């Protein structure tokens, strides 16, 4: 027999018949239907909604609404302004390694990002992970180029 979509059946015992509660004592789930004698959990309209704490102000309403969320994996950069690049001689290539060697950056823990504060007079080829729009405009206005590293 080939396996066809219309011939599929669930495994034996995989689908149980729905238990009909409250249909007489002999049915096994009659009278109180397994809900106990009294109390909120035995009443009609049960169960209570998730987060319900018996009438007291629930936790999700007690805590303040937060206006923002923190990123799980935030990107961190070693930032450097365009004005700091004036110390480097014109025509050279600037990257994180050369900045550490020149002593401009002291602790290179993360990729380099160039910010646009200040003015740039020298023509440089700058290699960095990210540039702000103003930094890119100032480097290119001075005759230099921006190379984005991955």
Curated annotation (Swiss-Prot):
Region (Disordered): 1-57
Comp. bias regions, Gly residues: 25-37
InterPro entries cross-referenced by the UniProt entry: Ribosomal_uL15, Ribosomal_uL15/eL18, Ribosomal_uL15/eL18_sf, Ribosomal_uL15_bac-type, Ribosomal_uL15_CS
GO cellular-component term (any): cytosolic large ribosomal subunit
This protein's record includes keyword Transmembrane helix: no
Keyword entries, A-Z: Ribonucleoprotein, Ribosomal protein, RNA-binding, rRNA-binding
PROSITE patterns, per the entry: RIBOSOMAL_L15
Gene3D superfamilies, sorted: 3.100.10.10
GO biological process: translation
Bias type Basic residues, positions: 12-23
Keyword check for RNA-binding: yes
Entry-linked Pfam families: Ribosomal_L27A
Gene Ontology molecular function, alphabetical: rRNA binding; structural constituent of ribosome
Domain of life the protein comes from: Bacteria
Quaternary structure (record): Part of the 50S ribosomal subunit.
Stated family: Belongs to the universal ribosomal protein uL15 family.
Function: Binds to the 23S rRNA.
Protein name: Large ribosomal subunit protein uL15
Source taxonomy: Bacteria, Bacillati, Cyanobacteriota, Cyanophyceae, Synechococcales
């Amino acid at each position: 027999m080939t396996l066809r979509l219309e011939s599929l059946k669930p495994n034996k015992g995989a689908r149980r018949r729905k238990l009909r509660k409250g249909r007489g004592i002999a049915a096994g789930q009659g009278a109180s239907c397994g809900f106990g004698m009294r109390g909120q959990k035995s009443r009609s309209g049960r169960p209570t909604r998730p987060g319900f704490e018996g009438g007291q102000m629930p936790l999700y309403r007690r805590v303040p609404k937060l206006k923002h969320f923190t990123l799980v994996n935030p990107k961190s950069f070693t930032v450097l302004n365009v004005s700091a690049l004036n110390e480097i001689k014109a025509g050279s290539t600037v990257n994180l390694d050369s900045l550490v060697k020149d002593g401009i950056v002291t602790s290179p823990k993360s990729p380099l990002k160039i910010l646009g504060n200040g003015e740039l007079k020298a023509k440089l080829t700058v290699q960095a992970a990210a540039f702000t729009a103003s930094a890119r405009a100032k480097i290119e206005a001075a005759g230099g180029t921006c190379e984005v590293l991955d």
